């Protein structure tokens, strides 16, 4: 789809990757960007094309209300996400897993269900879901987060089939570490939000159904055809070093 002149909505738009999406869409010539956040007062902007919008993605009724208010949207970017950094056997694993699923999986579904009719009414448009390389490879320290992202990836693939008939481009974005507050304690190499957003917007305009936004993600995706014994030795070694 063409970004110039489009009307877009970005969830989790008040900081990090979401804020970078808003800026890049404006730079690409978007006519309007709904910057959705739990508290729209946290959206910092002086551009009249930006419309702060209250949206807690875990609230299905609020997602439906947002869809009614933003009825001119042709591009929806589901970016809102959280990570509790819990391993499956941690004391707080169930609490962390439920919270992550509420935002990363059920929240994504709430937004997709609310806006699919809006996209259909506006010519099909595009629905973009932010996933992670952890949709495919799983470290204990982020095991519950990875489960939520794997679930979201599965939902995206199903939605792509469901929405193809109405002309909606459904894009799954996979990326490793991005330099945001969520990864503040991570010492591994990170992509900048601007690098990731540029790759995604290029993919949208090219009609892509999947965007692999960094080299780590491309490497892991290529290795998925291998036996697990080939994919996981590095994960095991890293875990063993931590617990030693």
Task: Go through the PLM ranges and name each one.
Residues 26-44:
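Conserved glycine-rich Rossmann-like NAD(P)H-binding loop of the short-chain dehydrogenase/reductase
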Residues 112, 148:
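Active-site helix of classical SDR
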């Amino acid at each position: 789809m063409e970004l110039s002149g489009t009307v877009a909505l970005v969830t989790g738009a008040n900081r990090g990757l979401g804020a970078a999406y808003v800026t890049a869409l404006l730079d690409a010539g978007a006519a309007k960007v709904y910057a959705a956040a739990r508290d729209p007062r946290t959206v910092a902007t002086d551009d009249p094309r930006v419309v702060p919008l209250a949206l807690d993605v875990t609230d299905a009724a609020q997602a439906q209300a947002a869809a009614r208010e933003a009825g001119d949207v042709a591009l929806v970017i589901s970016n809102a996400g959280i990570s509790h950094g819990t391993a499956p056997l941690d004391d707080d694993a169930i609490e962390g897993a439920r919270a992550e699923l509420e935002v990363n999986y059920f929240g994504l579904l709430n937004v997709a269900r609310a806006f699919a009719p809006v996209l259909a009414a506006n010519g099909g448009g595009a629905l973009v879901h932010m996933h992670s390389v952890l949709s495919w490879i799983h470290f204990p320290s982020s095991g519950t987060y990875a489960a939520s992202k794997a679930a979201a990836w599965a939902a995206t693939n199903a939605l792509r089939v469901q929405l193809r008939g109405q002309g909606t481009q459904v894009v799954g974005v996979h990326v490793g570490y991005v330099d945001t507050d969520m990864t503040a304690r991570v010492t591994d190499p990170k992509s900048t939000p601007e690098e990731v957003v540029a790759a995604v917007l290029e993919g949208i305009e090219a009609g892509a159904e999947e965007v692999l936004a960094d080299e780590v993600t491309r490497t892991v995706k290529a290795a998925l055809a291998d036996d697990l014994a080939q994919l996981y030795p590095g994960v095991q070694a890293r875990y063993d070093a931590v617990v030693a």
